[in-house]
Amino acid sequence: MEVGEVILTTQQLKQVLTIEPDNQEVYKLFNKLNNPFVVGAPVPPDRFVGRKSLIETAFDQIYNRSNLAIWGGPGMGKTSFLELLASPDVWQEYGEEPSQAVMVLFSCESIQPFTASGFWQEVLIELMDKLDSEPDLKSDIETLLDQGKATARGMRQVLGQLGKRNKFLVLLVDDYDAALRENPHYTQADIEVFLSECRSIAYQSREREYLSMIVTSLKRFNELGPSLTPDQSPWYNHYLFVVLRPLTETEVDTLLQGIPITPALRDVIQNMAGGHPALLQIAGSLLFRELRTGKLPDTETFAKEFESQTRHIFQDIWQRCRDVEQGLLILMAWSKLKGSLEQKITVDLSDIDLVFSQQELDLYSLEQQGLIMRNQDLEKPVYLFRSSIMEQWVIHKIQTSDKASLEKWETILLKLINP
């Protein structure tokens, strides 16, 4: 049921209860109308909004048995997107035939501690659960697992068997960052071997025609994983890279359609959420909760509640930024900071525009992460925070910093000024 339909049905049931307050059947129906916005969990495929071009790109890659790497910051909808691609209904909606595809979806974070053998074991176990119609192949996979052959070589054997049955594997891997981090059981050398094996299967082996691999990460791969050397091909060059950007205004309108909000409240949501999918789900959930009680919150009350509900997201975003990115965010907020910090931070920041002109790549990275936007209507680019709360969070973070933290920010800012 669409958001607008849920709200309309809620209003109709409330009218009935006004006339018949003892009608228990209507009361039960009223309580069953769940909030259509999803907070703290992936958005189900039937409530997924937008990303049409990216969905089409993903199906193009699957059709060609090629590979896709999707990256985006916290809450940008990576897991929701993978779950969408795993839905047979979505395949049919986009004119694709799901019967030959065996779809396996899991998160690398579920493998603790992450190891290459743990990865292949997880793939084979999940694959086995999808092969009830192929008992012989299911038995072969079980034998591989029992014999401790959950390896890249074993995976190639299974892909070959899938191909003989006119099937192929769509491997949807969330949180691929975990495969690029060392741990006590997974060394840098192990990482390099694992990535080489993945590239070999997906790009070089005969069995590649029975596999399409789609992975997600918080950052683009060239910022993660092993460094490249002149004598090696990039370990990630078999992927097409796409970034999950904030939702467009049209997509935001679609998400919030049917909610009778004032233009002022709509502007507050746009200003505070900035098109960020997780923030918009929280905003929609808060609004729906209030509407179900028969009232619409005023902008000030809504803003306070929204800020309280989203503080952890902004903290997560900040902590995941590199030092140079944090420094650039501080510079963007400097006009509102300098009055209270000019005695504490003594770095000469009189020519911030020059710093920005020298840091275009890192600013572009922040732009792609959906944290800032560039206004190019003026003679020179002007960078703005996408979310007013993110700007407030940066300001508060610096204003409440102790001496050691302020010295750290000074060092970062000096490096930006003198690259």
Where do the language-model regions lie?
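Conserved NTP-binding/hydrolysis module of P-loop NTPases
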Residues: 102-104, 108-136
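Short, amphipathic alpha-helical interaction segments positioned at domain boundaries
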Residues: 388-418
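Winged-helix-like regulatory helical subdomains adjacent to P-loop NTPase cores
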Residues: 52, 261-361, 365, 369, ...
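Conserved P-loop NTPase mechanochemical-coupling segment
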Residues: 125-150, 175-186
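Conserved Walker B catalytic segment
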Residues: 67, 150-220, 228-230
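Conserved adenine-nucleotide phosphate-binding loops and their immediately adjacent elements
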Residues: 25-49, 53-54, 136-140, 234-237
